[in-house]
C-alpha cells in the first residue's frame, strides 16, 4: 500500500469517528499527505481555546514517522517556538510502521494536557513548570487567550 493510500484510509477512518478533542480534520485539497486539524485540549489552561495543527506524512510513510506542528502559538515545554512537537511516539528511534495516526494524535492530546518537563524542547518553560507551576499556568493561560483559536461549539 502506498503512503497516499494508507494516509487516505486513516483520514477516512478518523473522520468517521472523530475523537472529541479534534475538529476540522482534513487533508490539503491537492495533497493527502498533509493534514490540518483543530486540537481542543480538555485541561486548563489549554482548554480555554483551540490550537491549529499540521500533520505532514513523508512519502516513506509508514516506514518513516509523520511530523506534527502547531500552527497556532502555544506556551508549552514540549513544543518549540516554531510549533514543532517533542513527541516520543514519532521520534525516529521509537517509530513503528504499525503505529496509526490516531495513536499519534491521542499521544499529542495527552502531552498537551499533561506537559512532560522531563523531555523539553524549551528548557526554560520546563524549569518554570517544575519550579513555579502557578506562574507557568498563569503565563500559559495568558498565551492561550492571546494566541489560541476560538473553540467551535
Swiss-Prot record:
GO terms for molecular function: ATP binding; ISG15 transferase activity; ubiquitin conjugating enzyme activity. Residues 2-149 form the UBC core domain. One of its GO terms (biological process) is ubiquitin-dependent protein catabolic process. Pathway: Protein modification; protein ubiquitination. The keyword ATP-binding applies. Pfam families: UQ_con (PF00179). It catalyses: S-ubiquitinyl-[E1 ubiquitin-activating enzyme]-L-cysteine + [E2 ubiquitin-conjugating enzyme]-L-cysteine = [E1 ubiquitin-activating enzyme]-L-cysteine + S-ubiquitinyl-[E2 ubiquitin-conjugating enzyme]-L-cysteine. The keyword ATP-binding applies. Its EC number is 2.3.2.23. GO terms for cellular component: nucleus. CDD domains: UBCc_UBE2L3. Keywords: ATP-binding, Nucleotide-binding, Transferase, Ubl conjugation, Ubl conjugation pathway. ISGylated. The active site is at residue 86. Catalyzes the covalent attachment of ubiquitin to other proteins. Functions in the E6/E6-AP-induced ubiquitination of p53/TP53. Promotes ubiquitination and subsequent proteasomal degradation of FLT3. PANTHER family: UBIQUITIN-CONJUGATING ENZYME E2 (PTHR24067). Belongs to the ubiquitin-conjugating enzyme family. This is Ubiquitin/ISG15-conjugating enzyme E2 L6.
Amino acid at each position: 500500500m502506498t503512503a497516499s493510500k494508507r494516509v487516505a484510509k486513516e483520514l477516512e477512518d478518523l473522520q468517521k469517528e472523530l475523537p472529541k478533542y479534534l475538529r476540522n480534520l482534513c487533508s490539503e485539497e491537492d495533497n493527502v499527505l498533509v493534514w490540518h486539524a483543530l486540537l481542543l485540549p480538555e485541561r486548563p489552561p489549554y482548554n480555554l481555546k483551540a490550537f491549529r495543527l499540521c500533520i505532514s506524512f513523508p512519502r516513506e510513510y509508514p516506514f518513516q514517522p509523520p511530523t506534527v506542528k502547531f500552527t497556532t502559538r502555544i506556551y508549552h515545554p514540549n513544543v518549540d517556538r516554531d510549533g514543532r512537537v517533542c513527541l516520543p511516539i514519532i521520534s525516529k528511534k521509537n517509530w513503528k510502521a504499525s503505529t496509526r495516526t490516531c495513536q499519534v494524535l491521542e499521544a499529542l492530546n495527552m502531552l498537551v494536557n499533561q506537559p512532560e518537563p522531563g523531555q523539553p524542547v524549551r528548557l526554560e518553560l520546563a524549569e518554570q513548570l517544575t519550579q513555579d507551576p502557578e506562574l507557568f499556568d498563569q503565563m500559559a493561560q495568558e498565551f492561550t487567550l492571546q494566541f489560541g483559536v476560538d473553540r467551535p461549539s
